[in-house]
Regions:
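Helix C-cap/helix->beta junction micro-motif
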Residues: 27-30, 138, 198-199, 315, ...
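Conserved glycine-rich beta-strand-loop-beta hairpin in the small C-terminal domain of fold type I
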Residues: 282, 299-309, 319-331, 363
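PLP-dependent enzyme catalytic core of the Aspartate aminotransferase-like
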Residues: 81, 335, 344-354, 359-394
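Conserved core segment of the aminotransferase class I/II
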Residues: 224-299, 306, 310, 389-390
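N-terminal small-domain helix-loop-helix segment of the aminotransferase-like
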Residues: 2-101, 109, 284-287, 391-394
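A short helix->loop->beta-strand "cap" motif at the edges of active sites that frequently abuts
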Residues: 119, 140, 198-201, 229-230
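Conserved core of the PLP fold type I
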Residues: 59, 63-194, 211-212, 219-223
Length: 394
């Protein structure tokens, strides 16, 4: 008996990082010391106070029961209070917050929940590859807006053709940005709200790296912008802020209709997140240890960025100096595609990087570096690459 995949399943894109991981693992199995800068998996432990919060929550018998379908009210209130404190945004915890088992779930669900097959969505190029999963599952039409170095990797809304803007139903934006490390300004978000209102386009702000701003920069929330809740939502994950990537905890906040649609689809897919994890999330948000721990984490990532970029510049390898996230967006030398360059680095220097083309056609002149190893290993990676003589030192 055969069990062929459905037509819908056959439209799903291949997992970009799966192929990269396979290549890296093959080299490691062959006995090579690979410096893996290709992935975006936080390397630091979850803050101790959150671990203790989970231990206590796991021992409460009530947390062994099913969670409430739309999440624990106490957790949603903590999320609303956090946004009020950090960004001055007032949220109704029951109507304007949706609990998610990781922000990826919300990003992939949204086209199912709020779009019809054939509707148009605008995605940034380059952008987070898993946005494409939602495009495929929602059977929607994809248009892209390029993120260009000359515009600090922010979309220029004039680059979106009038006919595309008029038919688009949603646009996804992600700042601080994966893969470029670019950050958004309040002025940019004001332009975004104006664009959304002019063309009746819903905005989805992926704020995964919101806490990670370098050189003293505090990343503004899209929802801080006047009129933002009229046109969109923002997704906030605990993965990067609190080193909780494996815990799968996030929330969406903002426009009531969009939040209700996400809640409704989740009623049919999940029974929310393990209650003890939600309780630990409350501890993460409310503890007086929160801000000092986050500040130490940001300083760590910034020191890694500086170590890597400074070493790279010395060998003639140029970067867009990231204003946030834990990535560096590096140029590819002439004569190579991003995939060819990544293969050379892995095979000859035993350094793994993510080819920019994996994030979109506009990313092909770059590779993404994950700043998720020690400064010493980052500098060692540059030293290995220097021996390949691929760059012209200035």
């Amino acid at each position: 008996m055969e069990f062929p995949e459905s037509n819908l399943m056959q439209t799903l894109p291949k997992q970009f990082f799966a192929a990269l991981v396979a290549k890296v693992n093959k080299k490691i199995a062959e006995g090579y010391d690979v410096i893996n800068l290709g992935q975006g998996n936080p390397d630091q432990p979850t803050f101790d106070y959150i671990i203790e919060g989970l231990k206590e929550a796991a021992e409460r018998p009530i947390n062994n029961k099913y969670s409430q379908f739309r999440g624990q009210p106490t957790f949603k209130k903590a999320c609303a209070a956090f946004y009020q404190e950090k960004y001055g945004v007032e949220l109704d915890s029951e109507k304007e917050i949706c609990v998610l088992g990781g922000s990826k779930i919300g990003l992939v669900e949204l086209p199912w929940a709020l779009m019809n097959p054939g509707d148009t969505i605008i995605l940034p190029d380059p952008g987070y590859p898993d946005y494409l999963s939602g495009v495929a599952l929602g059977q929607v039409k994809l248009e892209t807006v390029p993120l260009k170095a000359e515009n600090d990797f922010l979309p220029d809304y004039d680059d979106i053709p009038e006919d595309v803007a008029k038919k688009a139903k949603f646009i996804y934006l992600n700042y601080p940005n994966n893969p470029t490390g670019a950050v958004a300004t309040r002025e940019f978000w004001e332009k975004t709200v104006a664009f959304a209102k002019k063309y009746n386009v819903g905005v989805v702000s992926d704020f995964a790296y919101g806490a990670l701003g370098f050189d003293g920069y505090k990343n503004p929330s899209f929802l801080e912008t006047p009129g933002a809740k009229d046109v969109g939502i923002e997704l906030y994950t605990f993965s990067k802020t609190f080193n909780m990537a494996g815990w799968r905890l996030a929330f969406a906040a903002g426009n009531q209709e969009m939040i209700e649609a996400l809640n409704l689809i989740q009623d049919h897919l999940f029974v929310s997140v393990y209650p003890a994890v939600q309780d630990a999330g409350i501890v993460a948000l409310e503890s007086p240890e929160r801000d000092p721990e986050i500040a130490k984490l940001v300083a760590l990532y910034q020191s890694r960025r500086d170590a890597f970029v400074n070493a790279a510049e010395k060998i003639g390898w140029h970067a867009f100096k990231s204003g946030g996230t834990f990535y560096a967006w590096m140029t590819v030398p002439k004569g190579y595609t991003s995939e060819q360059f990544a293969d050379v680095l892995l095979n000859e220097a035993h350094v793994a990087v993510a080819p920019g083309k994996g994030f979109g056609e506009a990313g092909d002149g770059y590779v993404r570096i994950g700043l998720l190893v020690s400064p010493e290993r980052l500098v060692e990676a540059v030293e290995r690459i220097d021996k390949l003589n691929l760059f012209e030192k200035e």
